């Protein structure tokens, strides 16, 4: 049985293109592969930014945590458990000021946990611990950042790929929807191009 986790983060909710196409992929994969589909909407239920309760709570035993620490670490453990249980992860990220949303950054801050999702070798080299999973990363941007003059300002795609790889999620396929702000025809073409990418993903999975 295949366990699929979809994580969306667009403040626009279902109207966001990253959410739309991530949902199409996740639901299409469930149809093709069977199994379960779990959903985490970071815009509707944003995780808090990490604070002292989380930082201090994760380095002490459960029996010595304060109520605030237990709550903070409990949320992080819940988010880690969702990722750990998944065989396939579909991650939707709409670009905000050249990078991912703060909600998505907070999610990564909770699941990037030393000794749990990453560790270090004897030589001091970081090693991701969440291995053997497939990730579909759906990114959305109004401009075109995959090439051309603005490619240097894409602080979303490479950053997310690095964070995923750091915790062991190295099998990543990127699906972009971009160039939607240059008029109706450009938006139509951009969406059609992404729809073709989504079809290719689902045809390969079938």
From Swiss-Prot:
Output the SUPFAM superfamilies linked to this UniProt entry. Flavoproteins
User: What would be one Pfam family of this protein?
Assistant: Flavodoxin_2
What does the cofactor section's free text say about binding? Binds 1 FMN per subunit.
Q: Look up the EC number in the record and give it.
A: 1.6.5.-, 1.7.1.17
GO terms for molecular function, please?
Answer: electron transfer activity; FMN binding; oxidoreductase activity, acting on NAD(P)H as acceptor; oxidoreductase activity, acting on NAD(P)H, quinone or similar compound as acceptor
What this protein catalyses is:
2 a quinone + NADH + H(+) = 2 a 1,4-benzosemiquinone + NAD(+); N,N-dimethyl-1,4-phenylenediamine + anthranilate + 2 NAD(+) = 2-(4-dimethylaminophenyl)diazenylbenzoate + 2 NADH + 2 H(+)
UniProt keyword terms in alphabetical order: Flavoprotein, FMN, NAD, Oxidoreductase, Plasmid
Spell out the family assignment given in the record's similarity comment: Belongs to the azoreductase type 1 family.
- Which proteins does it associate with, and in what oligomeric form? Homodimer.
Q: What is this protein called?
A: FMN-dependent NADH:quinone oxidoreductase 2
| Organism of derivation | Rhizobium etli (strain ATCC 51251 / DSM 11541 / JCM 21823 / NBRC 15573 / CFN 42)
């Amino acid at each position: 049985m295949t366990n699929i986790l979809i994580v969306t983060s667009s403040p626009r909710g279902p109207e966001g293109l990253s959410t739309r196409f991530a949902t199409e992929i996740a639901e299409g994969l469930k149809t093709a592969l069977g199994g379960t589909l779990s959903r985490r909407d970071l815009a509707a239920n944003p995780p808090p930014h990490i604070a002292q309760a989380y930082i201090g709570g994760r380095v002490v035993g459960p029996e010595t945590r304060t109520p605030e620490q237990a709550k903070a670490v409990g949320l992080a453990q819940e988010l880690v458990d969702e990722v750990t249980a998944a065989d396939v992860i579909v991650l939707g990220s709409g670009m905000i000021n050249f990078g991912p949303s703060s909600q998505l950054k907070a999610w990564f801050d909770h699941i990037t946990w030393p000794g749990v999702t990453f560790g270090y070798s004897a030589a001091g080299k970081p090693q991701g611990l969440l291995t053997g999973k497939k990730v579909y990363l759906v990114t959305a941007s109004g401009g075109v950042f995959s090439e051309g003059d603005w490619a240097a300002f894409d602080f979303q795609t490479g950053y997310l790929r690095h964070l995923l790889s750091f915790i062991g999620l190295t099998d990543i396929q990127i699906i972009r929807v971009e160039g939607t702000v240059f008029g109706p025809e450009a938006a139509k073409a951009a969406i059609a191009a992404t729809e073709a990418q989504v079809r290719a993903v689902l045809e390969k999975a079938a």
